[in-house]
Amino acid sequence: VSCVLFDEFHERRKDADLALALLREAAPVLRPDLALVLMSATLDLSDLRDRLPQAEVLESAGRCYPVETHHQRARENESLPRQVLRALENHALTLPHGSGALVFLPGLREIERCRTLLSDANALQRWRIAILHGQLPLDSQSAALHRCGPEHDGTVILASGIAESSITIDAVRLVIDSGLSRQLRYDPNTGMEGLETVPSSLASAEQRRGRAGRQSAGQCVRLWSPAEQQRRPNFSPPELLLADPQPILMELAQWGAGLGNDLPWLDAPPQAAMQEGLSDLQALGLLQPNGQLSPTGRQLSTLGVHPRLGLLMLEARGRGCSKLGCDLAALLSERDPLAGCDAGCDLEARLTVVDQHRTLHERSRQLQQQLKRLGPPATKNNHSANAAELVLRAFPQWLAQERPGQPGRYLLRQGRGAVL
C-alpha cells in the first residue's frame, strides 16, 4: 500500500476522522513514504490548509454540464410531499422522454410519504416511481437505477443521502432537493445514537445539485428560499463531535491511545463525553481502570459491533441463547420493524417478526456468524433465555421502577422520568 484515499471527506464521518488521526500518528514512524489523500468535490480547503499546512493541494475541474438552479418556497401548511409534487409538475413534465428526476429526502419515512402521494398524482401517471435508500437490498437498489421502459415517460427516484455521492444514476436531468438531512447524534440519557433531521449544509446541497449535470445540462430545484440559503451552514459538523464516544474509546484502547489526547485529530472528540464514555465502559466491565481492554473487552472487540450490543451478544452466548442475543442486537441496531403499526413498545412482539423481516433476519444471521468465530459457547442450555435480562446487561441505565399510583410512569435508575 502506497496511498490511503479518504473519498467524500467533506462528510467528516467519524470513522474517517479516527482513521486519519491514527494514520497521521503511525505513518511518520512506520511508513514515512505513505501518502494520505483527502478527496471531495466540496472540501473546506481554507480550514484544511490551516490544519494541514504541509499538505499539497491538487484541484481538478472534472467534467460537469451546466445546471440551472431554482428556489421554491413552501406555501402555507404545504407538506413536504406536496412541495415535491409541485416541483415535479413545474419542471419534470417537459423533460425529454426517458429522463430521470432525482428527489433528495432525509429518510425512509419521507420517502414512503412521497411515494404514496406521487403514485396517485394524475400528472405522473406515466412516470415510474422508484425508491432508493440504504436499507434496500442490493437487487432493489440496482432496479431503481435502471432507465424506464417505453411505457413510461420518465422515472422519479425518491432517494436518501445514499444518492448524494455513493452512486451514479443514469439519465438524471432534474434534482429536487428537500434541503434536509439526517444527522447522527448521541443521547447520553439513553446511551444510544439517533438520527436528527436538520437543514443540510451548502456543501451537501452542491453535491446534490451536481447530480443533475453528470451526463447533460440539467436543473436543480431547491425547496427553500434564497434568504434561507444564506443561513445554512457551509459544512456539516464532524460526526466525531456528536457521536457516541464508546465505540471510539474501544478503538483507542486497542491502539493503546487512552482518551486519544495525544492523537493529531483534525477535531478532537469532546473531553467531557469521552470521560463519561470511559466511565460507562469501565462500569460495563469492558475497560480496566487503567483504560486497557479487559478480557471481555478484548473478546468483544473482535465482533465489530457497538460495545453495548456486543456485550448483549456475549451474555446471550454465555447463557446458551446466541440466536436470541443476535436477534435483539439486530432489532436494537435497525429501524423498528413495527413502526407505524400501532404495536406498542413490547420487545417480545418484535422478536416474533425478526425471521420474517429480510433486513433483520440477514443482520441477525451475520451477527451469529461473528459469534461463532469465538468458538463454542460455554453452555448449550437455554434455560435463562430472557430478552429483558439480556438487554439490561447492556443497557443498565434503562432499568425503571413504576411510580406508585401512576400507571405507565416510571423512574429510571439515574433519576430521570419515563412514560410508557
Model feature map: region roles:
Residues V1-L312:
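P-loop NTPase motor module signature
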Residues G304, L309, E315-R319, K323-L420:
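Extended, charged helical/alpha-beta scaffold domains that provide interaction surfaces
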